[in-house]
Amino acid sequence: MTSSLSRPSGRRADELRKVALTRHYTKHAEGSVLVEFGDTKVICTASVAERVPEFLRDRGQGWLTAEYGMLPRATHTRSDREAARGKQTGRTQEIQRLIGRALRAVFDLEALGPRTIHIDCDVIQADGGTRTASITGAFVAAHDAVSKLIAAGKLARSPITDHVAAISVGVYEGVPLLDLDYAEDSRCDTDMNVVMTGAGGFVEVQGTAEGVPFSRAEMNALLDLAQSGIGQLVQLQKDVLGAGHV
């Protein structure tokens, strides 16, 4: 896709920000990744607990769940910690449920066995796309946690069935764009988050017209952009994981 539009970032309409996935970023978690989408930076950890929630007791399967949060000064102005306020915001609950759903879509929970993988995504710097960056990085952290279970003889095979990644797209000044940063996201006419598997299946599509309703043609263009971008992210996941991955 080409366009005469000048994006605030200077990127092409179909160009991702610079994306980096740094594995083994923290010492203690079974899996940990620093994921960077431009100036958005998120630490994703995967921790294993040899137990399942009460609703899964004696069901012979495992579980994967996620939590999401932002450091107080991850954004332009400081926000109080949610723990200090005594409750999570609706946005936080929505995002962490999305992360959990996205990863469970590529897990065989019976093959995981009666254990839980806890995903924690902590935004240390936000410049748009924190939820999509979290999903993309959390997959790699979860993969590394599973690899440790296999190496320890606790799993005979990987319960991971495919890759999963996510990206934001939107209509900005009438032009469909891939991977919105904050300057674009805060001014776009349409904002959409797309989660897909490596095989090309859709896990979730969240799309909202911020002002001007979008057409079917614009929606199709956004989904095409998202599919292309997610394909690049899945390839990056494969590159950083190396041989022997899913």
UniProtKB/Swiss-Prot annotation:
Binding site for phosphate: R91, G129, T130, R131
SUPFAM superfamilies given in the database record: Ribonuclease PH domain 2-like (SSF55666), Ribosomal protein S5 domain 2-like (SSF54211)
EC number: 2.7.7.56
An example molecular function term from Gene Ontology annotations: tRNA binding
Presence of the UniProt keyword rRNA processing in the record: yes
InterPro entries found in the cross-reference section: ExoRNase_PH_dom1 (IPR001247), ExoRNase_PH_dom2 (IPR015847), ExoRNase_PH_dom2_sf (IPR036345), PNPase/RNase_PH_dom_sf (IPR027408), Ribosomal_Su5_D2-typ_SF (IPR020568), RNase_PH (IPR050080), RNase_PH_bac-type (IPR002381), RNase_PH_CS (IPR018336)
GO biological process, one term: tRNA processing
Cited PROSITE patterns: RIBONUCLEASE_PH (PS01277)
Catalytic activity: tRNA(n+1) + phosphate = tRNA(n) + a ribonucleoside 5'-diphosphate
Alphabetical list of Pfam families matching this protein: RNase_PH, RNase_PH_C
Family per record: Belongs to the RNase PH family.
Task of the protein: Phosphorolytic 3'-5' exoribonuclease that plays an important role in tRNA 3'-end maturation. Removes nucleotide residues following the 3'-CCA terminus of tRNAs; can also add nucleotides to the ends of RNA molecules by using nucleoside diphosphates as substrates, but this may not be physiologically important. Probably plays a role in initiation of 16S rRNA degradation (leading to ribosome degradation) during starvation.
Protein name as it appears in the record: Ribonuclease PH
Species annotation: Burkholderia ambifaria (strain MC40-6)
Organism ancestry: Bacteria, Pseudomonadati, Pseudomonadota, Betaproteobacteria, Burkholderiales
